[in-house]
C-alpha cells in the first residue's frame, strides 16, 4: 500500500467510515510521513476481534511509510469509555489494569515494526502523563477548553443521559477529556497528526482534534474505521461462547481458525478486504473463481489461513489446520498433546471420566445418546468411533491404548457428533 492515494486505497477496501477534512489529510499524507496513533484501553486481559481492524489500519499506514504509535490506556482503562454503552462499566483495580496494560502492549507489538528506521513504530501509555496530574491542573489546563453544552450533545453519551434508570457518572463523563488530551500530548511529544479508531470513537476523536488545535494551534486529523457487521445482522466477532479473543489462552488457534472458516459467503470477500493485505485484484479474482468453480468456495480457507497466520503465527496456523483435518477424517493419530489441549480448551464438548469407565457410559455422559440402551444400539450398528477407529463391541471397556498421552480420548457418534474425554 503506497502513500500516494492512501485514503483512496483505504476507501476502496471499505476501511473508512468517517474522516475529518479528507482533502487536507490526503494532501498532508502526500507531502511525507505522518505520525498517527490508535488507542487500546485495557478493559480485559486481551484484545478481541473488534480491535483487529484499527490495529491492522496502523500497520497499513506503516507499510505506506508512516509512523504508528500504539497507545495503551493505562489511565483511561481505569475510568472506562461510556461511548454507546448502555450501562456503567465496572471499575477495575489499578493492579489489574497495570497487568492488562502489559499484556495488551505485548499483544500489539507483533503487528507493527519497531525497527525499520525512520518510520519505526512506538508504544505509549497515557498513565505516564495522567498518573501524576493533580485535579486542579486537570480542571484548569484541560477542563477549561471543554463546553459541557457540546459534551452532552454528543451521540456517544446521549442515550445514557436520556435514561433516568442508568444515567452517567462524572467519572465516565470525563473520559472524553482524557482521550482528547491524549491526542494533544502525543502531538507535542511524538508529532502525532492523525488519530484513528473505531466508528464509536468519532466523538472522542473530534474532541481531541479541537483540544489539540486550541493547545498547539496545529492542524490535526481524525479517521474512523467502520463497525464490522455481518450480512445477517448478527454481531461480528462473537460466538455462542462469547468474544473471539486474540490471546490463544482465551480463544485457541483452532477455534479462531474455525471462526473464519464459518464466514458466510455473503461476507467473506468483504472480510478479505478488511482483515488481510491481499490485493483487491486478487480478491476479485478469487470471488470470480469461486463463482464459476461449481464447488464450495475457497475464500473462507484463504481468509482463515491469512488471519490465523497473522495473529497466531505459522505454528498456530499449522496446529489449527492439523486439528481441522484430523477431526474431518475422524482420526486422532496426527494430533499432538498441545492439539488436544486446544480441543479441551474450547474446541468441542469435554467430559471427565475415571479410568475403568465403559463406552456406553461415556456416550451417555457426553450427551451423544440419551440412554445406555441407545448407546448399545449405536455401538452395535458401527456408528461409534474411538480415536477414529470404529468400535462395535457393546460392552467395551476403555483400555490404556485408548488414552492418548495418557490423558485424552476422542469419541465420535456418527459423522459429526464429537466429544473429548479427559481422563482423571
Swiss-Prot record:
Keywords: Aminoacyl-tRNA synthetase, ATP-binding, Cytoplasm, Ligase, Nucleotide-binding, Protein biosynthesis, RNA-binding. One of its GO terms (molecular function) is ATP binding. Residues 357-414 form the S4 RNA-binding domain. It comes from the Bacteria. Catalyzes the attachment of tyrosine to tRNA(Tyr) in a two-step reaction: tyrosine is first activated by ATP to form Tyr-AMP and then transferred to the acceptor end of tRNA(Tyr). GO terms for cellular component: cytosol. A motif ('KMSKS' region) lies at residues 235-239. It comes from Photorhabdus laumondii subsp. laumondii (strain DSM 15139 / CIP 105565 / TT01) (Photorhabdus luminescens subsp. laumondii). It catalyses: tRNA(Tyr) + L-tyrosine + ATP = L-tyrosyl-tRNA(Tyr) + AMP + diphosphate + H(+). Its EC number is 6.1.1.1. InterPro entries: aa-tRNA-synth_I_CS, aa-tRNA-synth_Ic, Rossmann-like_a/b/a_fold, S4_RNA-bd, S4_RNA-bd_sf, SYY-like_C, Tyr-tRNA-ligase, Tyr-tRNA-ligase_bac-type. SUPFAM superfamilies: Alpha-L RNA-binding motif, Nucleotidylyl transferase. Signal peptide: none annotated. HAMAP family: Tyr_tRNA_synth_type1. ATP binds at residue 238. One of its GO terms (biological process) is tyrosyl-tRNA aminoacylation. PANTHER family: TYROSINE--TRNA LIGASE, MITOCHONDRIAL, TYROSYL-TRNA SYNTHETASE. A motif ('HIGH' region) lies at residues 42-51. Its main location: cytoplasm. Homodimer. Belongs to the class-I aminoacyl-tRNA synthetase family. TyrS type 1 subfamily. It is found in: Cytoplasm. The keyword Acetylation does not apply. This is Tyrosine--tRNA ligase 1. L-tyrosine binds at residues 37, 175, 179. PROSITE patterns: AA_TRNA_LIGASE_I, S4.
Amino acid at each position: 500500500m503506497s502513500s500516494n492515494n492512501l485514503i483512496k486505497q483505504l476507501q476502496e477496501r471499505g476501511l473508512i467510515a468517517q474522516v475529518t477534512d479528507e482533502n487536507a489529510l490526503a494532501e498532508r499524507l502526500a507531502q511525507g510521513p505522518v505520525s498517527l496513533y490508535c488507542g487500546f484501553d485495557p478493559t480485559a486481559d486481551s484484545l478481541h476481534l473488534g480491535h483487529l481492524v484499527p490495529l491492522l489500519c496502523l500497520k497499513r499506514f506503516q507499510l505506506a511509510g508512516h509512523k504508528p504509535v500504539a497507545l495503551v490506556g493505562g489511565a483511561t482503562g481505569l475510568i472506562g469509555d461510556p461511548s454507546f454503552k448502555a450501562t456503567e462499566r465496572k471499575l477495575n483495580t489499578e493492579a489489574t489494569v497495570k497487568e492488562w496494560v502489559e499484556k495488551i502492549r505485548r499483544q500489539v507489538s507483533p503487528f507493527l515494526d519497531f525497527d525499520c528506521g525512520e518510520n519505526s513504530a512506538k508504544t505509549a501509555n497515557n498513565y505516564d502523563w495522567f498518573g501524576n496530574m493533580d485535579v486542579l491542573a486537570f480542571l484548569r489546563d484541560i477542563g477549561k477548553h471543554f463546553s459541557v453544552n457540546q459534551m452532552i450533545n454528543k451521540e456517544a453519551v446521549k442515550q445514557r443521559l436520556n435514561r433516568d434508570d442508568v444515567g452517567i457518572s462524572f467519572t465516565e463523563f470525563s473520559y472524553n477529556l482524557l482521550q482528547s488530551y491524549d491526542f494533544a500530548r502525543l502531538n507535542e511529544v511524538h508529532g502525532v497528526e492523525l488519530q484513528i479508531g473505531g466508528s464509536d470513537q468519532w466523538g472522542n476523536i473530534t474532541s481531541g482534534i479541537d483540544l489539540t488545535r486550541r493547545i498547539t494551534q496545529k492542524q490535526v486529523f481524525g479517521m474512523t474505521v467502520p463497525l464490522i457487521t455481518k450480512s445477517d445482522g448478527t454481531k461480528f466477532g462473537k460466538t455462542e461462547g462469547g468474544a473471539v479473543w486474540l490471546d490463544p489462552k482465551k480463544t485457541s488457534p483452532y477455534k479462531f481458525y474455525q471462526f473464519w472458516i464459518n464466514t458466510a459467503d455473503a461476507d467473506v470477500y468483504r472480510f478479505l478486504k478488511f482483515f488481510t493485505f491481499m490485493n483487491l485484484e486478487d480478491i476479485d479474482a478469487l470471488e470470480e473463481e469461486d463463482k464459476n468453480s461449481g464447488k464450495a468456495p475457497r475464500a473462507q480457507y484463504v481468509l482463515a489461513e491469512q488471519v490465523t497466520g497473522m495473529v497466531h503465527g505459522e505454528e498456530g496456523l499449522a496446529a489449527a489446520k492439523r486439528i481441522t483435518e484430523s477431526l474431518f477424517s475422524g482420526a486422532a493419530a496426527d494430533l499432538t498433546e498441545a492439539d488436544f489441549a486446544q480441543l479441551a480448551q474450547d474446541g468441542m464438548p469435554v467430559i471427565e471420566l475415571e479410568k475403568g469407565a465403559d463406552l456406553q457410559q461415556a456416550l451417555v455422559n457426553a450427551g451423544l445418546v440419551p440412554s445406555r440402551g441407545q448407546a448399545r444400539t449405536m455401538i452395535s450398528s458401527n456408528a461409534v468411533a474411538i480415536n477414529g477407529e470404529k468400535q462395535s463391541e457393546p460392552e467395551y471397556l476403555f483400555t490404556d491404548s485408548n488414552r492418548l498421552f495418557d490423558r485424552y480420548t476422542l469419541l465420535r457418534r456418527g459423522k459429526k457428533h464429537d466429544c473429548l474425554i479427559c481422563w482423571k
